[in-house]
Amino acid sequence: MMKLNLFINAKETESYIDIHAPKMNDHVQSIINAVNDLDKSHTLVGYIDKEIHIINVSDVITFQVINKNVTAITSNQKFKLKLRLYELEKQLPQHFIRISKSEIVNKYYIEKLLLEPNGLIRMYLKDAHYTYSSRRYLKSIKERLSI
């Protein structure tokens, strides 16, 4: 059980969080990630033809570059975005992982991983399709998934 203290002080000029822990562990890291994600975008604007849609980021399974356009893929729709993948990556919460030059996946939609003989990771996603990681991102993927 973690102890929580809240101190309200009108003399403070800004809000801040201090974390006191005997050591760094997964629980502490998840708190840090949650706090960092507070400033991240939780919705995006996507397009289907001439329709404009507000997309809940947590519904997105993967962001892929398709025909030079960034596409957000949910379980039932594909939305074109006007952002570049590197811009999007900066705005997304911590549970999105860059797996290649052209794709970012939501780690909560990863069902299983298969290590290929060529060193790549085949990621099976919960929408019944799979994708491959790039070797360039392999170290980062393993760190983010704690494998």
UniProtKB/Swiss-Prot annotation:
One of its GO terms (molecular function) is DNA binding. Pfam families: LytTR. Residues 44-147 form the HTH LytTR-type domain. It is found in: Cytoplasm. Signal peptide: none annotated. Keywords: Cytoplasm, DNA-binding, Transcription, Transcription regulation. This is Uncharacterized HTH-type transcriptional regulator SAS2254. InterPro entries: LytR-like, LytTR_DNA-bd_dom. GO terms for cellular component: cytoplasm. It comes from Staphylococcus aureus (strain MSSA476).
